Regions:
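Thiol-/selenol-based redox modules, centered on thioredoxin-like
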Residues: 153-199
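Short active-site neighborhood of thiol/selenol oxidoreductases, capturing the structured segment around
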Residues: 55-73
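N-proximal helix/coil linker or "cap" segments that precede and/or mark the start of modular domains
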Residues: 17-38
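Thiol-based oxidoreductase modules, predominantly thioredoxin-like and allied folds used
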Residues: 95-107, 125-134
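A short beta-strand-turn-helix
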Residues: 40-60
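N-terminal export signals
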Residues: 5-21
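Conserved helix-turn-beta segment immediately C-terminal to the redox Cys motif
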Residues: 78-98
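Short, internal strand/loop/helix patches
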Residues: 115-160
């Protein structure tokens, strides 16, 4: 386990997940929509989208960062999130949407991301995203995927292995290590609907 995975794991509760909601007195993980930059991105399917308007607004979503040539945490994270996608079944792409954003947009073209997604058995409803480097960096920082140590933060190979998930319509957001038990991650994503509580 690298330092970032350890920090992420230590920052969340015993089951590996932590929720934040506006107005509860808890630290706000992400506010809407001001903290969601509406930058242009390209999907692994070749479409151009706006981050907030097209991907986040009114939806239940997951967001994580990765890059295709990563040999550290990324392959395990992607494989684990593929199990989350399977656990959520046909809801992914219908009313739950998954997004993985490359940390190396200068390398990860839509074609590269398409190959990466195919190699990991990614199904419809999960988009891999690239864009202009400055826009991707803005997203990373505004979404909170930042290490407090500037030297560590500058090292892409030590990026934070966390998945952010939430419901924009309810302004309910949480995060957990992307290597948490996939069934637990799926359960807490479903909790974001507001009609249920975790068992």
């Amino acid at each position: 386990m690298n330092r970032r995975t350890f920090l992420a794991a230590g920052a969340v509760s015993a089951i590996g997940c932590a929720a934040f909601r506006r107005g509860t007195g808890a630290r706000e993980a992400v506010a809407r929509p001001a903290r969601f930059p509406n930058v242009l991105l390209r999907t692994h399917e070749g479409r151009t989208v706006r981050f907030y308007d097209d991907l986040i607004r009114g939806r239940i979503v997951t967001v994580n960062f990765m890059y295709a040539r990563c040999q550290n945490i990324c392959p395990g994270m992607t494989s684990n999130l593929a199990m989350v996608q399977r656990a959520l079944g046909k809801r992914v792409g219908r009313d739950i949407f998954m997004y993985s954003i490359t940390l190396k947009p200068e390398e990860d073209t839509p074609a590269v991301l398409r190959s990466y997604a195919a190699a990991h058995g990614v199904k419809p409803g999960w988009l891999f995203l690239t864009g202009e480097p400055d826009d991707v960096e803005t997203l990373r920082r505004r979404l909170g995927f930042v290490d407090p140590d500037p030297a560590v933060d500058a090292d892409t190979s030590q990026h934070i292995g966390v998945v952010l998930y939430g419901n924009d319509a309810l302004d309910r957001w949480a995060a957990c290590p992307a290597l948490s038990d996939p069934d637990e991650i799926a359960k807490y994503i479903l909790w974001m609907e507001g009609r249920r509580r975790p068992a």
